[in-house]
Amino acid sequence: MERVIVIGSGVMGRGIAYSSALGGFSTTLVDVKEEQLIGAKKEIQQITDKGVERGKMSETDADSINERLTYSVHLEDVVKEADLIIEAVPENIDIKRSVFERIDQHAPSHCLFASNTSTMSPTEIGSFTKRPEKVIAMHFFNPVHKMKLVEIVRGLETSDETAAAIRSVAEKMGKETVVVNEFPGFVTSRISALVGNEAFYMLQEGVGTPEEIDKAIKLGLNYPMGPFELGDLVGLDTRLNNLKYLHEKLGEKYRPAPLLEKYVKAGRLGRKSGKGVYDYQKND
């Protein structure tokens, strides 16, 4: 395993690309938008610069990470030499279908496919390809460069060899792994979605302010981030998409809070839009 391709240069994709390069893999980050890649490159450079400033890595290590990273808008060209392709596009099954059908046509036969999905079926995703035994879910957490866990989920056809290879890749990236059985939401997203959604119901009901609810969860339940802080970081649109999927698959307890839907309709998506539950523009 030498060459890794990451598709999608959003918050998750750029973090995965950084972790891949940190693990020693030659890594290409792919997106349809050149400006997205420019932003991703800048952010990854900032991460390595901070690592040097804080004494967590040497300048030589930082330079090596950035040298192992390339950026491209030409998906079909770069996947031809891939050993592993990690998909990190939005949680929309039609978008994922399009991506996996395209890469299946152009990637070499030995190449493994991983989806960074936090909720969706790797069995279904594998069915979009002619190599379902080489398809798996590889769920990273935000911010990727800080969060240690990778949740690995096998599909029905995923081979033992694929699962072992993906676990090895994650460990080379410096991650801890858990391997769980396929079920909508896996382990972490089923819990996280409920907490985040209930927080919106509480805000809607006037139980407390966002600051008070976040503080209560952090100090009372020992969470590192409050549900609104985390939602703004992940993206409220992503949180809503996850809830809609889980509501469809698992039932009423995952019905999205109306206030969350209202925020997304208003374009209040979190940090990436400048405003979510909290206003980040006033800090500029």
What are these regions (language model features)?
Residues L22-G24, L29, I65-L84, S168-G174, ...:
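Amphipathic alpha-helical segments at domain termini/boundaries
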